[in-house]
Swiss-Prot record, chain A:
The protein's name: Collectrin
Record keywords, A-Z: Cell membrane, Glycoprotein, Membrane, Phosphoprotein, Signal, Transmembrane, Transmembrane helix
Cytoplasmic membrane side: 163-222
Positions of the record's site feature: Cleavage by BACE2: F125, L126
Top-rank lineage group of the source organism: Eukaryota
Main location per the UniProt record: membrane
Physiological role: Plays an important role in amino acid transport by acting as binding partner of amino acid transporters SLC6A18 and SLC6A19, regulating their trafficking on the cell surface and their amino acid transporter activity. May also play a role in trafficking of amino acid transporters SLC3A1 and SLC7A9 to the renal cortical cell membrane. Regulator of SNARE complex function. Stimulator of beta cell replication.
Name of a matching Pfam family: Collectrin
GO molecular function terms listed in the Swiss-Prot or TrEMBL record: protein homodimerization activity; transporter activator activity
UniProtKB/Swiss-Prot annotation, chain B:
Family (UniProt): Belongs to the sodium:neurotransmitter symporter (SNF) (TC 2.A.22) family. SLC6A18 subfamily.
Positions of transmembrane segments: 27-47, 52-74, 89-111, 179-201, 208-230, 254-276, 289-311, 400-422, 443-465, 475-497, 518-540, 569-591
Name the record gives this protein: Inactive sodium-dependent neutral amino acid transporter B(0)AT3
Source organism per UniProt: Homo sapiens (Human)
NCBIfam families: Na_transp
């Protein structure tokens, strides 16, 4: 009798948990990819932990606080490591709706990942999209800060250059004497404008007959 | 000609003094920096790759020797001799040719508009490189946070960052969209940097050029060393440099080589004329021309090696990822243990599985992974820098550092070219005396930079990239070729070959050899005529552009669309505008002469003046004919 009951139970379980069954989810783990040398082997103890995590997630759902580890059924464990699981109700006759299981897993995905040292890419619940981490948005984007710094430096540099240019010009205007010495060398200077010497004498201001002045300067080197 | 052979007219620099380079190195670096630009990094390697690898160097060298160096020499020589910017130089050669100078100024203005926009994009990427992880490394999640944004999912994180988060591009050129504020402030910053460096002309440029011209070489060396140590680099180099001689039979190769050498040396901008005009007249411009052209050439090669080794790494990386994805599909579907199929075993395993479970394998999304396919994927222009390189950069350890170095290099390269381009606009304006004498030079440069910045804001619109491509294709290419052609013809045939050789003999101490004379007289104009014809032929095809349209069925491929009527009109206008100055100026000059002749004739009715006498250009604008 007991044997019959046992077979019946396993048969029912087998029906409930099957690849592609209603409310069943496929899980895929990539332990070696995630951990490399430190990868652990997937054995029944790990399966037990998995069942415990799923049960834990379900218990957080209102109305499902009575979920036990035995309500979570695993099947078709492959070498990949992948398997299917379903969560049954306390009567163990029906499986809980996929929507509930999905939302429960989604809310606790982080805890489940951490229990196995995996992340969203290496512990995949096919058909349950994981909630992506919110993008790290600092209140002020970094590029604006750097831009602000650089722009301020540029503005200061421009201001300094303009100011130094103004000072230089003021200094030059106050020293016309230096200009006179150079005029002697300038006799041969010919510009494009029809051979009239260029006019450094403008610096002296006033109305001066330039041609006359040039002659004068040449003859009186003092 | 302004300065007849007389003792040292340059010694007299007074109130009107023309600024001078502090030393020869500044001048050489400025010309080199102007010549070496973004094109050396992202255009030459692409051409090399497309046109048969090492074999492309043959037409390239031939074009350099017969076209690039001779025209370059002409520009440096006339700038140095006549000591004026492009407008002054051409007015001095012949008043009827003053349009060439005006055309150069207009062209440089148009080019500076879009070139600095590219520099602004580079600046934006540079600013965004100061974070880890880099913003283009992953797609942003969508609203429910269940997956990634659809556009990003369909293309790639780097493409999404470029087209959406940087440009925010519209799907059509008709749809202008709004101004993107982040691009606008980057553009403002770029123009501020340019202003800061050209504020007092070569006085300030000469100081900055030490950094902006040399820093790219430093970074290229670092990238070269790094690139050669990356896995797959040698495969990239071998594949990309292996010469494919058959491709030389395609005439396109020769034409593209010639146009590339042309733009690469930044000829016909007027920038080299401007720079050379600040030289002392007795400078060996012939040696300078050869040296700078060769340095530019070597830089292109050097950059290609660095670029190809990085591309080889990328191709190998992509190939391995492709294999890995296929292997994962197999493992997941058949539930094999993890990492049970290595990359080498994959073909055998696939064959075996295909034999035993053909239907199941056929359903899997397996892609054919061939290394050559990945190596063949070439990109040029902004696509290389902002999409291909950023993606490669993500795979290199220490990604933000490499990104900073790369974009820093592009920024300084673009900047040094901008100096030449802006100087090509400012020097003629200064010479012509657009603003009164009491206005300081800083104000003029500021005004020019402000006008350029305001005009360039159209490129910060959402459709800005499409407009930039229009400017690049239609404003630059045809005009540069036609203006260069007019330059050579103007100097050789209007100014006179003999007089030009005499001037060069006076400046450099030796007469130009027959090579120079032959290339100036015959080869360069001939080549240029061919290119102009080629460019015109290009226009006969319907004008198309490639749009980024997320709703396109074949997304992420770009959708080919025709330019609307008004855009086509803009294309034509841009390609004609600078060159139109030539006939307009010549006509204006003719009319002025005629009017003067009539006026003189009316004032002195007894003198028997033949109208021709006055229309001869020599009497007015060449005072040295009186001096000789």
């Amino acid at each position: 009798m007991l044997w019959l009951l046992f077979f019946l139970v396993t048969a029912i379980h087998a029906e409930l948990c099957q690849p592609g069954a209603e409310n069943a989810f496929k899980v895929r783990l990539s332990i070696r990819t995630a951990l490399g040398d430190k990868a652990y082997a997937w054995d029944t103890n790990e399966e037990y932990l998995f069942k415990a995590m799923v049960a834990f997630s379900m218990r957080k759902v209102p109305n499902r606080e009575a979920t036990e580890i035995s309500h979570v059924l695993l099947c078709n464990v492959t070498q990949r490591v992948s398997f299917w699981f379903v969560v049954t109700d306390p009567s163990k006759n029906h499986t809980l709706p996929a929507v509930e299981v999905q939302s429960a897993i989604r809310m606790n995905k982080n805890r489940i990942n951490n229990a196995f040292f995996l992340n969203d890419q290496t512990l995949e619940f096919l058909k349950i999209p994981s909630t992506l981490a919110p993008p790290m948005d600092p209140s002020v984007p970094i590029w604006i800060i750097i831009f602000g710094v650089i722009f301020c430096i540029i503005i200061v540099a421009i201001a300094l250059l303009i100011l130094s240019g103004i000072w230089q010009r003021r200094r030059k205007n106050k020293e016309p004497s230096e200009v006179d010495d150079a005029e002697d060398k300038c006799e041969n200077m010919i510009t494009i404008e029809n051979g009239i010497p260029s006019d450094p004498l403008d610096m002296k201001g006033g109305h001066i007959n330039d041609a006359f002045m040039t002659e004068d300067e040449r003859l009186t080197p003092l | 000609m302004a300065h007849a052979p007389e003792p040292d007219p340059a010694a007299c620099d007074l109130g009107d003094e023309r600024p001078k380079w502090d030393n020869k190195a500044q001048y050489l670096l400025s010309c080199t920096g102007f010549a070496v630009g973004l094109g050396n990094i992202w255009r030459f390697p692409y051409l090399c790759q497309t046109y048969g690898g090492g074999a492309f160097l043959i037409p390239y060298v031939i074009a350099l020797v017969f076209e690039g160096i001779p025209i370059f020499h002409v520009e440096l020589a006339i700038g140095q001799r006549l000591r004026k910017g492009s407008v002054g130089v051409w007015t001095a050669i012949s008043p009827y040719l003053s349009g060439v100078g005006l055309g150069c100024v207009t062209l440089s203005f148009l080019i500076s508009l879009y070139y600095n926009t590219i520099v602004a994009w580079v600046l934006w990427y540079l600013l965004n490189s100061f974070q880890h992880p880099l913003p283009w490394s992953s797609c942003p999640p969508d609203l429910n946070r269940t997956g990634f944004v659809e556009e990003c999912q369909g293309s790639s994180a780097v493409s999404y960052f470029w087209y959406r988060q940087t440009l925010n591009i519209t799907a059509d050129i008709n749809d202008s969209g709004s101004i993107q504020w982040w691009l606008l402030i980057c553009l403002a910053a770029s123009w501020a940097v340019v202003y800061m460096c050209v504020i007092r002309g070569i006085e300030t440029t000469g100081k900055v050029i030490y950094f902006t011209a040399l820093f790219p070489y430093l970074v290229l060396t670092i990238f070269l060393i790094r690139g050669l140590t990356l896995p797959g680099a040698t495969k990239g180099l071998i594949y990309l440099f292996t010469p494919n001689m058959h491709i030389l039979q395609n005439p396109r190769v020769w034409l593209d080589a010639a146009t590339q050498i042309f733009f690469s040396l930044s000829l016909a901008f007027g920038g080299h004329i401007a720079f050379a005009s600040y030289n002392s007249p007795r400078n060996d411009c012939q040696k300078d021309a050869v040296v700078i052209a060769l340095v530019n050439r070597m830089t292109s090669l050097y950059a290609s090696i660095a670029v190809f080794s990085v591309l080889g790494f990328k191709a190998t990386n992509d190939y391995e990822h492709c294999l890995d994805r296929n292997i994962l599909s197999l493992i997941n579907d058949f539930d094999f243990p993890e990492q049970s199929i290595s990359r080498d075993d994959y073909p055998a395993v696939l064959m075996h599985l295909n034999a035993t479970w053909p239907k199941r394998v056929a359903q899997l999304p397996l892609k054919a992974c061939l290394l050559e396919d990945f190596l063949d994927k070439s990109a040029s222009g902004p696509g290389l820098a902002f999409v291909v390189f950023t993606e490669t950069d993500l795979h290199m350890p220490g990604a933000p550092v490499w990104a900073m170095l790369f974009f820093g290099m592009l920024f300084t390269l673009g900047l040094s070219t901008m100096f030449g381009t802006v100087e090509a606009v400012i020097t003629p304006l200064l010479d012509v005396g657009v603003l009164p004498r009491w206005v300081p030079k800083e104000a003029l440069t500021g005004l020019v930079c402000l006008v350029c910045f305001l005009s360039a804001t159209c490129f910060t619109l959402q459709s800005g990239n499409y407009w930039l491509e229009i400017f690049d294709n239609f404003a630059a290419s045809p005009n540069l070729l036609m203006l260069a052609f007019l330059e050579v013809v103007g100097v050789v045939y209007v100014y006179g070959m003999k007089r030009f050789c005499d001037d060069i003999a006076w400046m450099t101490g030796r007469r130009p050899s027959p090579y120079w004379r032959l290339t100036w007289r015959v080869v360069s104009p001939l080549l240029l005529t061919i290119f102009v014809a080629y460019i015109i032929l290009l226009f006969w095809k319907p004008l198309r552009y490639k749009a980024w349209n997320p709703k396109y069925e074949l997304f992420p491929s770009r959708q080919e669309k025709l330019y609307p009527g008004w855009a086509r009109a803009a294309c034509v206008l841009l390609s004609l505008l600078p060159v139109l100055w030539v006939p307009v100026a010549a006509l204006a000059q003719l009319l002025t002469r005629r009017r003067r002749t009539w006026r003189d004739r009316d004032a002195r009715p007894d003198t028997d003046m033949r109208p021709d006498t006055d229309t001869r250009p020599d009497t007015d604008m060449r005072p040295d004919t009186d001096m000789r």
